[in-house]
Amino acid sequence: MRILVSNDDGVDAAGIRMLASVLREAGHEVTVVAPDRDRSGASNSLTLDLPIRLKRIDHYTVSVAGTPTDCVHLALTGLLEFEPDIVVSGINNAANLGDDVIYSGTVSAAMEGRFLGLPAVAVSLVTRNHDPKHFETAARAAVEIVARLKADPLPADTILNVNVPDLPWNEVKGFEVTRLGNRHRAEGCIAQKDPRGNEVYWIGPAGREQDSGPGTDFHAVRTGHISITPIQVDLTRYQALEKVASWVGGLSAALDQPA
């Protein structure tokens, strides 16, 4: 298969290098289009106010001064001379579990591929303190999942969010299909002063696990399993439609009132 690989940790990150290498060893034609530096937490942001510069590192690798979404968007709307068969994003050097997917550049790169009509997979290694031991395990999981997608495609609106425990391949307990869990509210921001006495702030850590029982992505990786969560872009809260619809009459009546 022709595979577009991207990430949010940057084009030189160990995870993306391992992913591209193992996919090539499996016989795939891999092109890497990735940010020129770490863009973790970039979510789905597109650069619209500046031109996007890039550097062609070699025939198969492009470094982009932009977000993960920029990378995939450019690749699929004009940069590449061919249409890939699938987008694989990763390997992220940290978990993307539960609410993390809203902020994740790794997941957003895959999501942009899905927006533009391609199957898409986001792969993350659940590391401790960003100290990865077994990127090869996550890469092998990606190879297996790509093979399965080729043989048995999913519906067109589906993205796979894959989280892999940081274990040797032979210590992984198996694969589990999961739903997204969620976290408690994020911890507070961290206030500091710069050398000139001006206030500066750092975003605080993500909240601790809250909804993390059996069936969730949190539980799967905690018990040594590879979590596969099918996700989609439709953010509609269908359970609230009827309640909100009950307001509409009153809201519409306000249109008849004087301004």
Curated annotation (Swiss-Prot):
Q: Which reaction equations make up its catalytic activity?
A: a ribonucleoside 5'-phosphate + H2O = a ribonucleoside + phosphate
InterPro entries linked: SurE, SurE-like_Pase/nucleotidase, SurE-like_sf
- Is Cytoplasm given among the entry's keywords? yes
| Leading EC class | hydrolase
- Give its E.C. classification number: 3.1.3.5
Q: Which family does the entry's similarity section mention?
A: Belongs to the SurE nucleotidase family.
- Which PANTHER family does this chain map to? 5'-NUCLEOTIDASE SURE, 5'_3'-NUCLEOTIDASE SURE
- This protein is called 5'-nucleotidase SurE
Q: Which organism is it from?
A: Stenotrophomonas maltophilia (strain K279a)
